[in-house]
């Protein structure tokens, strides 16, 4: 999952508030300029693998972060001559970020710097000032976004609640400030003048023109041409949406009830594993089990409990959220509908889809419907076996139509009957899941990714030991991304092991975007700067990858993280985003890396999933953690086939979620604001669309993407269709082809968001007609059965 590559409104993702005081004095820190050579650990070639797999090795080389337990205290006590001691730093090597107070100071300093840039933008009307206008807008965007992105990450992953609170405060403040800028008539009209004046525009680069147009569109989406009171309403609504949205996303993991009560006599009589039952708490009287709705127990029962009544109770409870969460979603949907009305749009979807590859809600809905029509019969065919087993057990016979199948199989049936089916076929697979796990340690997969990237892109991943305080947990690995041509091109902080309090979803967080450092920039930077082979200074892209992989004890003192194949796929997916961030180097940050159209941003990550499912790639990665023996193809194949189990049902489920997203942000919402029932809309849509129908739970309140990917959730399916075309054209024959890697890199990755996505696809596929991005192009992309 990509974090906020949705740009939101002007200047990138999200917006902030502001407390500016010219009298504030703050320390300045020297630039950290890194030339071609990196500072990674220079030992044997297995360092990267060992750093993830050998805990004793990692704790030894990173012992400074394991032993540093003293509180950092106030930043002012630690500053010595405006610098920290050389072996200490703050988060992401930003020397402000050693404490929550330091984060607030960094935010305040950034606002002060931003205000100076705004003052210059408003006052400098010289020819040179107008020529540099877009560059300065981009610098303003970068200054604000480096706080916004940082705060977004800290809110999701930092273990210190005081840091999280400080991040929330800074985020909200910055959000307000950015929305003020988004509705600044002076800034907008000057930008419009720069773009429309032929003499000025002729001196701008293609990148500057593209960024200028994007920012002008953002101004216009903020109601810039409307009356001042309307613009004020826009700011208020946007800020309310941000606050409620953050509350919504922070509560998607919570269930309505912590347990389901089932009679002991009823559950004990069903032949369920006694060891599993022994782990379930009973009530005081000892007559009822209190089945938890979290952890592995409810899912184990969904696989093993023959009673449909009990399975349904468990499944619904696991997927139910609180009434308060439904109210948050309802308020979020209402506010977005009001915002779209304010801006003269028929729906929030219409507002959101401006500037996307699929240009309007009609195109999106047609794409989803076409995909559903194609997928539904195949999903029914996949469920046929489950339906027959269910009806056979009920002694009702079989020979079912598509309609009968879809009415028979409910969501709480899937795991139970799938387990029966797999148990009956398990004898065909000589290698159990546990055996395959032993070949795919996290370290093996990370080293395998590095080897793959070196083959197709000419870049590799190298370990670097972080300074004290540079990471938020000693378990975080710092990885330098090294190009064979240019040396260090970016940094990835890998927070991959499970830890209490962190986000439960795998995610790619942008911390700092790449951009060229202009010669006229003289102020010191708090981020790392590199120099490329042409002598150009550029801001290193910095990202954080977050996963929740668990470790397995292999002895009394040692543990290893083994990855299931779906987890390998997850890591490849997030690394796809990472490569986009690293290789999408542009002169301006507004269009670097993942700063591209929302319905294009998932392409690099989804394409990487194809590599993760290719046995040729997996054979180069899988090595037994003890014997170092390479995994055999015959061991992999059954598991790769298993990954395809009910794949069309999964695709249809994604399509249903995309349709729910369009429904909750569609035209009908505005006419139901006084009596909006999001749960009824969800359940009615489920009944209408069919396939594993859920008309019992209020799961829509747990659909977190309704905040981050509002009206654009279809992007996952859309980009999956594009990825299938690119895989077939470039990598299916040889996944290690450098020629294909270069073509893909040069056609897609290197552009970030600086090129029309349809032109990128047309170039990658050698189909110039796709550059139009018209109905025929969308139809071509949708004509695939390899999702």
Curated annotation (Swiss-Prot):
Query: Which superkingdom?
Result: Eukaryota
A Pfam match? Peptidase_M3
The family line of this record is:
Belongs to the peptidase M3 family.
The record's disulfide annotation reads: none
Q: Where in the cell is it found?
A: Mitochondrion matrix
GO MF annotations, alphabetized:
metal ion binding; metalloendopeptidase activity
* Keyword field: Hydrolase, Metal-binding, Metalloprotease, Mitochondrion, Protease, Transit peptide, Zinc
Q: Tell me the Gene Ontology biological-process terms attached to this UniProt entry.
A: intracellular iron ion homeostasis; peptide metabolic process; protein processing involved in protein targeting to mitochondrion; protein stabilization
Q: Which InterPro entries match?
A: M3A_MIP, MetalloPept_cat_dom_sf, Neurolysin/TOP_dom2, Pept_M3A_M3B, Pept_M3A_M3B_dom
Q: Which reaction does it catalyse?
A: Release of an N-terminal octapeptide as second stage of processing of some proteins imported into the mitochondrion
- Which cofactors, if any, are listed as required? Zn(2+)
What protein name is recorded for this chain? Mitochondrial intermediate peptidase
Q: Does this UniProt record's set of keywords contain DNA-binding?
A: no
Q: Which PANTHER family match?
A: MITOCHONDRIAL INTERMEDIATE PEPTIDASE, PROTEASE M3 THIMET OLIGOPEPTIDASE-RELATED
This enzyme's EC code(s): 3.4.24.59
Q: Where does Zn(2+) bind?
A: 573, 577, 580
| Range of the transit peptide | 1-36
Protein's job: Cleaves proteins, imported into the mitochondrion, to their mature size. While most mitochondrial precursor proteins are processed to the mature form in one step by mitochondrial processing peptidase (MPP), the sequential cleavage by MIP of an octapeptide after initial processing by MPP is a required step for a subgroup of nuclear-encoded precursor proteins destined for the matrix or the inner membrane.
Task: Show the SUPFAM superfamilies listed in the entry.
Answer: Metalloproteases ('zincins'), catalytic domain
In the UniProt record, which is one GO cellular component term? mitochondrial matrix
Q: How is the cofactor bound?
A: Binds 1 zinc ion.
Record's keyword annotation contains Calcium = no
What residues form the catalytic site here?
Answer: 574
Q: What class of enzyme is it?
A: hydrolase
């Amino acid at each position: 999952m990509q974090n906020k590559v949705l740009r939101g409104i002007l200047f990138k993702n999200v917006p902030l508030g502001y407390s500016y005081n010219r009298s504030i004095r703050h320390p300045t820190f020297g630039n950290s300029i890194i030339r071609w050579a990196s500072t990674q650990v220079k030992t044997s070639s297995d360092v990267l693998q060992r750093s993830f797999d050998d805990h004793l090795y990692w704790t030894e080389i990173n012992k400074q972060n394991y032993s540093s337990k003293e509180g950092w205290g106030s930043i002012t006590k630690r500053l010595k001559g405006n610098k920290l001691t050389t072996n200490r730093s703050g988060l992401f090597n930003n020397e402000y970020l050693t404490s929550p107070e330091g984060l607030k100071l960094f935010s305040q300093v950034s606002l002060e710097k931003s205000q100076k840039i705004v003052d210059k933008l408003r006052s400098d009307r010289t020819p040179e000032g107008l020529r540099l206008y877009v560059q300065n807008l981009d610098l303003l965007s970068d200054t604000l976004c480096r706080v916004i992105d940082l705060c977004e990450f800290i809110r999701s992953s930092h273990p210190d609640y005081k840091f999280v609170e400080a991040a929330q405060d800074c985020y909200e403040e910055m959000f307000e400030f950015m929305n003020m800028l988004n509705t600044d008539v002076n800034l907008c009209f000057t930008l419009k003048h720069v773009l429309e004046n032929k003499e000025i525009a002729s001196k701008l680069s293609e990148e500057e023109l593209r960024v200028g147009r994007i920012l002008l569109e953002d101004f216009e989406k903020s109601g810039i041409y409307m009356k001042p009171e309307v613009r004020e309403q826009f700011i208020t609504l946007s800020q309310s949406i941000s606050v409620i949205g953050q509350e919504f996303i922070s509560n998607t993991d919570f269930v309505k009830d912590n347990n389901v009560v089932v009679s002991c006599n009823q559950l004990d009589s069903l032949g369920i594993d006694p060891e599993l039952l022994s782990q379930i708490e009973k009530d005081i009287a000892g007559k009822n089990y209190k089945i938890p709705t979290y952890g592995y127990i409810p899912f184990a029962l969904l696989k093993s409990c023959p009673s449909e009544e009990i399975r349904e109770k468990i499944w619904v409870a696991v997927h139910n959220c609180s009434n308060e969460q439904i109210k948050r979603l309802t308020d979020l949907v209402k506010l977005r509908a009001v915002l779209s009305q304010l801006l003269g749009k028929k729906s929030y979807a219409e507002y959101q889809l401006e500037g996307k590859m699929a240009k309007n809600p009609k195109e999106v809905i047609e794409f989803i419907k076409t995909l559903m029509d194609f997928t539904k019969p195949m999903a029914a065919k996949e469920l046929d076996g489950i339906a027959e087993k269910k009806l056979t057990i009920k002694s009702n016979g079989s020979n079912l139509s598509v309609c009968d199948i879809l009415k028979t199989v409910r969501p709480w049936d899937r795991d139970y009957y799938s387990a029966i089916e797999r148990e009956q076929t398990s004898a065909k697979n000589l290698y159990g899941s546990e055996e395959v796990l032993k070949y795919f340690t996290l370290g093996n997969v990370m080293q395998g990714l590095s080897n793959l990237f070196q083959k197709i892109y000419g870049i590799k991943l190298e370990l670097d030991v972080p300074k004290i305080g540079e990471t938020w947990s000693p378990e975080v690995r710092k990885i330098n991304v090294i190009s064979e041509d240019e040396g260090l091109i970016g940094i990835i902080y890998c927070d991959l092991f499970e830890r209490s309090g962190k986000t439960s979803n795998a995610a790619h967080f942008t911390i700092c975007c790449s951009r060229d450092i202009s010669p006229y920039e003289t102020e010191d930077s708090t981020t790392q700067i590199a120099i490329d082979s042409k002598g150009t200074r550029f801001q290193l892209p910095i990202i954080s990858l977050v996963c929740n992989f668990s470790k397995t004890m292999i002895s009394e003192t040692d543990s290893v993280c083994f990855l299931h194949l779906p987890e390998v796929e997850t890591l490849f997916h997030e690394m796809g985003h990472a490569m986009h961030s690293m290789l999408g180097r542009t002169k301006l940050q507004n269009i670097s890396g993942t700063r591209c159209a929302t319905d294009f941003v998932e392409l690099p990550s989804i394409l990487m999933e194809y590599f993760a499912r290719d046995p040729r790639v997996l054979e180069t990665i899988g090595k037994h953690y003890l014997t170092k023996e390479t995994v055999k193809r015959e061991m992999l194949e059954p598991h790769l086939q298993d990954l395809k189990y009910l794949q069309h049902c999964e695709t249809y489920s994604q399509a249903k979620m995309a349709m729910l997203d369009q429904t909750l942000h569609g035209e009908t919402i505005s006419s139901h604001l006084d009596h909006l029932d999001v749960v009824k809309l969800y359940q009615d849509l489920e009944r209408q669309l069919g396939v594993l129908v859920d008309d019992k739970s209020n799961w829509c309140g747990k659909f977190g993407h309704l905040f981050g990917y509002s009206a654009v959730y279809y992007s996952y399916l859309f980009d999956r269709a594009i990825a299938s075309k690119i895989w077939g054209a470039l990598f299916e024959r040889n996944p290690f082809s450098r020629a294909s890697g270069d073509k893909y890199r040069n056609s897609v990755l290197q552009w970030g968001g600086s090129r029309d996505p349809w032109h990128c696809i047309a170039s990658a596929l050698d189909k110039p007609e796709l550059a139009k991005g018209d109905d025929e192009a969308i139809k071509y992309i949708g004509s695939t059965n390899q999702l």
